[in-house]
Amino acid sequence: SFNGDGGLREVILGMGWRPFKPISLGFNASYLWGDYTHNMTMSFSESTAFSMARIYSAEISTYNLQAGFQFIQPINKTDKIVIGGTYTLGHDVNNDAYRKTETLNSATIETESIDTIRNAFQLPHAIAAGITYYRSDRLRIGVDFELQKWSECKFPNQQTAISTSTTPSSESYQALKGQLNDRTKLSAGFDWTPNPLSLGSYFNRCTYKAGAYYSKSYANADVTGTIKDKPYEFGVSAGITLPVANKNIWYNIPRINLSVQWVHTNIPYLNAATLRQSVLKENYLRFCIGVTFSERWFDKWKVQ
């Protein structure tokens, strides 16, 4: 049986600066903390047989640094193109990982051992870039690309050496690089408001949105080197933003956001029975609803 628990939390402090009109610079610093526990138990129906339990755990406490830029190129009085990019610093995470192995009979723990990996984790270097076309206050079309270099990060995992005619099988708990894949994501979308200041039609003041993305996961199920394909995911979404107040203004009014998203995941793995590649596929829908009471709540602080 398998079960697990845990997760990460993050607090972010960000600041932006516009040294001159077309260019803005930004910087984010964040603190990450959390933990995880993964339990694996192998038991047998015979009361005289010993069971084995393994508990993998760690506590994480580290920082994250990100810098970015934005360049605005006006086309005319109402239209413009915005180009942006970010870089996230990869670094060592100086936290340890633990593996506890227990051998149990029906009532007590017979043996117990703990393996420790010092400085077992790394965060990846990451870059992202995007371009957006603005047509007045009515239309936005954008494309984004993101790359995270997880293949260069070390991560704890159990390593097993298969027995040969001269050496018995063995296993160890190590933090090694190359166990994860680089993560990439390509996204595109648009939103359109027919007429933000329309007095004659409510639906002309609504904003209609749609988008799609394709992502290759950092997860790596190819433990034997025999799986050719990589895990991937793609999805499409659509939504509408409904202004609540019937006013002659567009900004700083309450809104209701409704959206639906369809997601497909494709995870190849090695079938233990046939020793051939199999694929785990999932399709699911997400329905989201959100309320913005007043956009003034989200005004950014400015340092004079």
Question: Which positions does each model-derived feature cover?
Answer:
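Outer-membrane beta-barrel porins/channels
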Residues: S1-Q304
